[in-house]
Amino acid sequence: MPSTTLLFPQKHIRAIPGKIYAFFRELVSGVIISKPDLSHHYSCENATKEEGKDAADEEKTTTSLFPESNNIDRSLNGGCSVIPCSMDVSDLNTPISITLSPENRIKSEVNAKSLLGSRPEQDTGAPIKMSTGVTSSPLSPSGSTPEHSTKVLNNGEEEFICHYCDATFRIRGYLTRHIKKHAIEKAYHCPFFNSATPPDLRCHNSGGFSRRDTYKTHLKARHVLYPKGVKPQDRNKSSGHCAQCGEYFSTIENFVENHIESGDCKALPQGYTKKNEKRSGKLRKIKTSNGHSRFISTSQSVVEPKVLFNKDAVEAMTIVANNSSGNDIISKYGNNKLMLNSENFKVDIPKRKRKYIKKKQQQVSGSTVTTPEVATQNNQEVAPDEISSATIFSPFDTHLLEPVPSSSSESSAEVMFHGKQMKNFLIDINSFTNQQQQAQDNPSFLPLDIEQSSYDLSEDAMSYPIISTQSNRDCTQYDNTKISQILQSQLNPEYLSENHMRETQQYLNFYNDNFGSQF
């Protein structure tokens, strides 16, 4: 046998791996236990699962107030954002899906399947486009700060934004008071503050106050000695001693005005003015290129670093720098803050026009009535514009005013003056009673209320001479038959009703023209 294997060595070498594989196969089959029968075990497990499903179906039929699992916000992954706990969260889908593009842009799309009640096609048969394709700008520091100095809230109120720290206020007065806090030189300063003393012994951290009430509260709290047991809310009515000079006061209510600002305190430092003058700056309104407004103080103020991300604030600072004289408009203040000096800022502030102009009341004496001079037939004609511009009429001189023309009807004053000569006569009432000679020269005399009279004076009526007689009582009596006839004719009811209707129609047209009505 060995001799035979030597004759065919390659053949026997190839058969060795097969023999080794057969050996290990027999070894494994003898050592490992055979597979058990698990059919009975599977049948029991399936039965328990079916019982669990039946119980779950029964639980689903009964409504529950709280869900079985916690609601987790997976809005960025396509889940729902805010879901009430009493809703079934298993069937809900978000109507908007948000994804992040490789360019770091947030992209939002509307899911058509999640919109309830939406029809896939319109009445025309064209498909509805549900994707918006709206992309927002990349995230930047400017997104965290407001870009406008004023913005309108949902309720219509305007919100004001501080130019120096982006703080928001709903009332402009609060913004004005807040801007004073950014000023380097405060409006009020404690006269007893000493920066050379240690910080623990100072009366205040800086000694400056932007508001007068806090300034007075500081002086009463730190520089007045009160009796023991006096509460802070009762200090104004309490007595006390000045902590600097020792002077006694029965009440501390007017301590600042009567003792400090008046200069009566003997402990005041040298060079201290008797009255602490207010040194707060004024506000200037600046409009940027996009139409927004910014309020800037004229005093030196500190600007927070985060405001530099606001483009409106940077543009407002540029406007201040271009319209100010000096090189120290913007300078470094401290480690990470800037100082804006707008003291020399020049801007043209338009004056506000008053909505309501107060009319000057004219004082009219009851005894004297001012009337123009008498115009005779030979006098030159006076234009109505010259009369209205050169003469100041009193409330009793309404007969000298021109009537208002109407498009639909003529006024009663226009009906009376048909001749050009009647319009140019200005009559002095004193000449009618005192000057008899003038009556004979110029018989065309009109009554003082000629424009208010409701009858038409013809030339024949005015050409009749006036006869005067002297009575025993030294009074002048006038007898004119023609005028008496005209006075009787004006009492005609038909003529009076026509004039009344004409005047009513004129007033109605005037009312409709001014108020836009259609009566």
UniProtKB/Swiss-Prot annotation:
Annotated zinc fingers (C2H2-type), start-end: 160-182, 188-223, 240-265
Tell me the protein's name. Answer: Transcription factor STP1
Q: Which GO terms describe its biological process?
A: positive regulation of DNA-templated transcription; positive regulation of transcription by RNA polymerase II; regulation of transcription by RNA polymerase II; tRNA processing
The answer to whether the entry has keyword Metal-binding is yes
Q: How is it modified after translation?
A: Phosphorylated by casein kinase I. Phosphorylation is not dependent on the extracellular amino acid levels, but is a prerequisite for proteolytic processing.
Does the record bear Plastid in its keywords? no
Residue ranges annotated as compositionally biased, kind Basic and acidic residues, are 47-61
Other notes on this protein?
Present with 1310 molecules/cell in log phase SD medium.
